[in-house]
Regions:
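Thioredoxin-like thiol-disulfide oxidoreductase module
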Residues: 43-71, 76, 95-101
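Short active-site neighborhood of thiol/selenol oxidoreductases, capturing the structured segment around
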Residues: 2-26
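Iron-sulfur (Fe-S) cluster-binding modules
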Residues: 105-138, 145
Length: 479
């Protein structure tokens, strides 16, 4: 039984010099194969003029289905329309052998590379996947009336933290999901306080709302994974009347790859990655977990970090271990650490020129975390600026020396801090009167580097007064 005659499909676009070059070839193929040749045009349906039966593929449906990357592409098809083989670009001998037309394009140049398919235009892959690919989304679609303002609709539905959000359209969410290899329906964990199952898709939706770029998404996912660790005690943190909220410190190559700020104004405004990664976690807590102010969130005052509290560590000094390295990771690891912290407390010391003096000075500020007379209750982060770091470095001190000196300076006799001492009712219980106490538990003081190179200023982020095993501990997540 003779083999079935193959059919051919040619995909072209007018805006391609190589496609324009092979117009005579298209005419030859049409004469040879007649109805066995189909020509799909990605841009201008009037092209090619020599083949009036051309098929409009401006929707790119056919091109997407056949994964066309270069035009012209010539497909040889089985009788059922499935692909048998393909060639692309223009190579005279290859096309002659592929089609069996010995004189095909005889007067043309021997070779000319093809052009990029319109399916590869910037951003088009996600557009086509959304239009023609399998359905990925499990989240409920919200239809808006034509007269509804999309920005106001986000406020009215309670999706915002009080600032404008980016509407999470299917295309934006899909582009966010494309930034990870994890499945959209993978459950990361349950988000308190309502303990709602949280999928990768839900994280993506809130990352879009926060204004994240897709390349930030792995960091957002890692921060959510860290926040859901039992050691972090997110449920308790959300329910407390205290000031605290999640503080994110990011280490490793990712900070440079996505342009995070650990330098000038590191804890301030102006850096999109810093601002939106932290905000994504806060919005997720609100929109998925139900942690809404006035509801389960009954903070007496709160702090501005409940919008976003995220920064990169300055790792430019190779002799100074990063926070991630303190937690057992390597310098080349990308790591996000979460701390239950309050607002920022400035530390001014423009006079100390010796490590000993500066350590004593920093310790005085650290004593005031939560209250001068409350010890071993709240952890803290000490952010040391480059100029203060220089004082330690020039004095020959390592980070370990700084930590040891601070712990030594933070020891105090219980008689100084028990309730009623110095005429102040607040303080430690009477049972600590005859003890020597340290301001922080053994793993309660975390030293981080950040800030601009000008200014003898450092800072303290005080922790939740339920720090430690009874409440929240700093957690880290490699990604």
């Amino acid at each position: 039984m003779p083999a079935a005659t193959p059919s051919y499909a040619l995909i072209v676009k007018k805006d391609c010099p190589t496609c324009a070059l092979i117009e005579p070839v298209i005419a030859q193929l049409a004469a040879r194969f007649a109805s066995a040749l189909s020509v799909y045009v990605q841009d201008d349906h009037a092209f090619p003029a020599s083949f009036p039966e051309r098929i409009d593929d401006t929707s790119l449906a056919y091109s997407y289905a056949h994964k066309i990357e270069i035009v012209p592409t010539l497909l040889r098809l089985h009788a059922d329309g499935t692909e048998q083989d393909r060639i692309f670009g223009w190579d005279k001998k290859q096309w002659q052998q592929f089609t069996g037309v010995a004189d095909l394009g005889q007067k043309l140049v021997a070779f000319k590379p093809g052009c990029g398919s319109k399916t590869l235009d910037p951003g088009m892959e996600a557009v086509l996947a959304l239009k023609f690919g399998p359905q990925l989304f499990k989240a409920r679609a919200v239809a808006l009336a034509d007269a509804e303002d999309i920005m106001e609709a986000c406020f009215e539905r309670g999706w915002s933290d009080g600032l404008p959000v980016v509407p999470p359209t299917p295309l934006r969410v899909l582009r966010m999901l494309r930034a990870t290899t994890r499945a959209a329906d993978e459950i990361i964990g349950r988000v308190p306080p309502d303990n709602v199952p949280c999928s990768v898709e839900k994280v993506a939706i809130n990352a879009v709302l926060a204004g994240c770029r897709p390349e930030y998404f792995p960091t957002v996912l890692a921060s959510v994974t860290a926040a859901l660790q039992d050691r972090f005690c997110l449920h308790g943190l959300l329910c407390t009347t205290y000031f605290s909220s999640p503080v994110l410190i990011v280490n490793g190559p990712v900070t440079r790859q996505i342009g995070m700020n650990g330098g000038v104004n590191a804890l301030g405004q102006g850096n999109r990655a810093n601002a939106t990664i932290g905000r994504a976690l806060q919005l997720l807590v609100r929109n998925v977990g139900g942690g809404i102010p006035g509801g389960i969130d009954r903070a007496t005052l709160g702090n501005p970090g409940k919008y976003t509290y995220c920064f990169a560590e300055d790792e430019s000094d190779s002799d100074w271990p990063s926070l991630a390295m303190d937690r057992g990771f390597e310098r080349d690891d990308s790591v996000v650490s979460l701390f239950a912290g309050d607002g920022l407390q400035g530390v001014v010391d423009q006079q100390s020129r010796s490590p000993e003096s500066l350590a004593k000075s920093l310790a005085l500020s650290l004593r005031t975390v939560a209250h001068h007379k409350l010890f071993a209750m709240a952890d803290a982060i000490l952010i040391i600026s480059p100029e203060h770091r220089r004082v330690f470095r020039q004095g020959g001190w390592t980070k370990a020396n700084v930590r040891d000196a601070l712990y030594s300076e933070l020891m105090i006799a219980g008689t100084e801090i028990v309730r009623g001492a110095h005429g102040i009712a607040e303080g430690m219980p009477e049972k600590f009167r005859d003890k020597i106490l340290n301001k922080f538990r053994d793993d309660g003081l975390h030293i981080v580097s950040a800030g601009g190179k000008a200014g003898l200023f450092s800072a303290v982020i005080g922790g939740w007064v339920a720090s430690g095993e009874r409440g929240s501990q700093l957690v880290s997540q490699k990604f």
